[in-house]
């Protein structure tokens, strides 16, 4: 059962980073990822106008169960509880009068400002049940840099594409039960699209592929991942929008430890859906509140998340 306990450590250490990188648990090391799940669901294909804009994300994730590769409660683990909260700031600069291949040019940087994780669970051992718990919190656990993104604007379809780079900005301590850093970097090709099929209706999608580098502290390399954030919105009034949002997530290659695939591959999977409401008194300013519930989960915790997002020009 010790291996199960260690797997739970892996399922938690990077949870918070999943939320608050412009990003919560999955297969991979730490059960997390360096790219947000379920964050980019509103107007993501629409590159801001020339100049500086910023987005702030505040979120909470909570779960009371962790599942195995068959989607069943993990054997030997009981009374599981995880609560994670974090905040991210993302700056976007669109270069005035600059074009490449017909698209506008954006440079993007992001920084997780704060993360707080509380974890507890019981492990069944031959000698009886053992309670484990841990917490971690601190500032600036991870960062994002995208030197060149391209954005194209049409009458009803807006698209953005490019490569983002995610990296830890806090040390990873393999001796700790919980870390706020994943301990590894990721290279992430990404494509964002927003379509307005009719006035007052928005369809948004964000497709990303993550190639994860090795965590030098543990010699563990998380498998490659693909995720799709989605949103379908309806304008109740000029400044108010409601709709459904969520994500589809699948890890597509096995995790590796010391260069060899871990038993079973530890591939994560999850789907989420939930409602959102958005207030946007102008085209450049908006506040979005959304909730998502996870299902069809494998090799990760299953829970709920809440996001509060702000977008405005500087």
Task: Please provide the spans of the model-predicted regions.
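Outer membrane beta-barrel transmembrane domains
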Residues: 31, 73-74, 216-314
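Short loop/turn motifs that connect adjacent beta-strands in outer-membrane beta-barrel proteins
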Residues: 26-30, 43-51, 95-105, 152-159, ...
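Extracellular loop and loop/strand-boundary signature of outer-membrane beta-barrel proteins
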Residues: 41-42, 73-79, 128-135, 173-179, ...
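Transmembrane beta-barrel strands of outer-membrane/channel proteins
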Residues: 35, 54-62, 107-113, 161-167, ...
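Sequence/structural signature of outer-membrane beta-barrel proteins
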Residues: 63-65, 114-120, 153, 166-177, ...
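Surface-exposed strand-loop-strand hairpins of Gram-negative outer-membrane beta-barrel proteins
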Residues: 28-33, 61-86, 122-136, 177
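Residues that define the transmembrane beta-barrel architecture of outer-membrane proteins
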Residues: 81-89, 103, 137-144, 181-187, ...
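Residues on the lipid-exposed face of transmembrane beta-strands in outer-membrane beta-barrel proteins
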Residues: 44, 56, 89-93, 145-150, ...
């Amino acid at each position: 059962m010790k291996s199960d306990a260690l797997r739970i450590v892996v399922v938690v250490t990077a949870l918070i980073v999943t939320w608050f990188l412009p990003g919560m648990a999955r297969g991979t090391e730490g059960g997390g990822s360096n790219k947000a799940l379920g964050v980019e669901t509103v107007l993501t294909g629409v590159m801001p106008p020339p100049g500086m804009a910023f987005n702030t994300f505040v979120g909470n994730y909570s779960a009371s169960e962790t599942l195995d590769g068959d989607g069943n409660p993990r054997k030997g683990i009981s009374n599981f509880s995880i609560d994670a909260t974090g905040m991210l700031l993302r700056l976007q600069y669109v270069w005035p009068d600059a074009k490449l291949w017909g698209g506008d040019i954006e440079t993007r940087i992001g920084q997780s400002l704060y993360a707080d994780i509380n974890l507890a669970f019981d492990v069944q051992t031959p000698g009886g049940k053992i309670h484990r718990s841990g917490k971690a919190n601190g500032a600036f656990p991870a960062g994002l840099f995208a030197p060149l993104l391209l954005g194209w604007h049409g009458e009803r379809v807006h698209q953005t594409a490019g490569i983002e780079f995610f990296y830890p900005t806090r040390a990873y301590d393999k001796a700790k039960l919980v870390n706020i850093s994943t301990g590894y970097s990721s290279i992430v090709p990404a494509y964002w699209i927003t379509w307005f099929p009719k006035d007052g209706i928005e369809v948004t999608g964000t497709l990303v592929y993550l190639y994860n580098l090795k965590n030098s502290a543990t010699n563990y390399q998380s498998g490659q991942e693909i995720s799709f954030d989605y949103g379908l919105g309806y304008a109740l009034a000029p400044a108010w929008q409601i709709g459904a949002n969520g994500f589809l997530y699948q890890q597509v290659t096995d995790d590796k430890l010391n260069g060899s695939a871990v038993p079973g591959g530890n591939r994560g999977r999850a789907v989420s859906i939930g409602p959102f409401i958005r207030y946007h008194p102008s085209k450049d300013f908006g506040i979005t509140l959304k909730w998502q519930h996870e299902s069809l989960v494998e090799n990760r915790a299953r829970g709920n998340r809440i996001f509060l997002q702000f977008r405005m020009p500087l």
